Amino acid sequence: MEHPVKVNDILIVQAGTGTDQIGRFDIMVDTDLNAVDTYTWSTVPIDETHCPRDESLENFIMHYKDLTDKKYGRLVTRFARKLEHPSRIQETPLGSLVADALQESLGIDVMLMGSGAIRSYNLGPVVLYSDFTECFPYDEAVYMLPVTGEQLTRMIKRFLREEAFTGEHTEFYQLSQGMHVVWSRSAQCFKELTFDGKPLGAQQIYKVGVCKYHYSSLKPFLDITLEEVEANGRVRVLATSYRDVIEEYFMMHQHLKREIEGRLVIEE
């Protein structure tokens, strides 16, 4: 746009597209009328002649770039192979590993790890801190819920409701090792539901981990109330940062790998 266009007493300009030039708009304002008195408009090519390098500014920027590169460029771990998380509504290798890391580190029976909190479709085999934080951008506490087998069954059934598979917004979870669930969508029931190879004991207490976001919405997400949980025992905060727990686990265990094991099988 060579000249400004005035529309409803508003000056409109455009410096073109791309990064070849920038626009310069010098405006003199009449403070008595609170209006533009005079103006000049020009486009300035972005080149060495019109935009010389500012070495002081470059050095200032590079100082902080070096610091961020040092922080985010460090190695966290190496997996045996790349681990995938292609969909939030299925068991995934990366989801299983994350659930296992929290279960083992926090000493609980079952970890329900929100699938949506894993933000990368894959991770590894070389995992830099930048990759790690991109995959796990959220950082929350983990709560331990003492629940009965009957209640855990109800919680799992809740996130496997049909809306999860028809595109509606629901919460879905990755299961830690020991869990084996076979769910029939057509019959809307469990064909199998075991923990460590045994059926869940209806009145047996299981220590189940959930992150703060899910803890704050237990009824809509998992069909259980905090009052029901507290009737079984005290709810405890096991960690204030699940991301720190996962990072430490990854750093302490090199060449980790996971496969689709059948922890969660969805049948039509």
Predicted regions and their residues:
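Active-site neighborhood of phospho(di)ester-bond hydrolases with catalytic His/Asp-centered motifs
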Residues: 1, 12-15
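Short, function-defining helix-loop hinge/capping sites that tune catalysis or transport
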Residues: 5-6, 156
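Short, structured coil segments at secondary-structure junctions
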Residues: 7-9, 106
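Catalytic centers of hydrolytic enzymes
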Residues: 16-105, 109-268
